[in-house]
């Protein structure tokens, strides 16, 4: 099953996550089909906290990909901010 989830990046004490579409059996930071955005939980000042390619997310959801709980919340926040 395809899932949209967060893949950890960044450095020590500075987490950074990529929103990726991957098979649910792959490891968290393993191979993925496509990167559809990023999430920076420690963004400061003018740094962008969340960026999502809404068109690609809509495509993957229409094909049957399931978002993780955290990604579903981030997508909801992103849609609210865009409106």
UniProtKB/Swiss-Prot annotation:
Keywords: Ribonucleoprotein, Ribosomal protein. GO terms for molecular function: structural constituent of ribosome. GO terms for cellular component: cytoplasm; small ribosomal subunit. Pfam families: Ribosomal_S16. It comes from the Bacteria. This is Small ribosomal subunit protein bS16. The lineage of its organism: Bacteria, Pseudomonadati, Pseudomonadota, Gammaproteobacteria, Pseudomonadales. It comes from Pseudomonas fluorescens (strain SBW25). Belongs to the bacterial ribosomal protein bS16 family. Gene3D superfamilies: 3.30.1320.10. One of its GO terms (biological process) is translation.
């Amino acid at each position: 099953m395809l899932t949209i989830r967060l893949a950890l990046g960044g450095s020590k004490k500075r987490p950074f996550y990529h929103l990726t579409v991957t098979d649910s059996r792959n490891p968290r930071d393993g191979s993925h089909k496509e990167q559809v955005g990023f999430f920076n939980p420690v963004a400061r000042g003018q740094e962008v906290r969340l960026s999502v390619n809404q068109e690609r997310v809509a495509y993957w959801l229409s094909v049957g990909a399931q978002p993780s709980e955290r990604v579903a919340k981030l997508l909801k926040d992103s849609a609210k901010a865009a409106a």
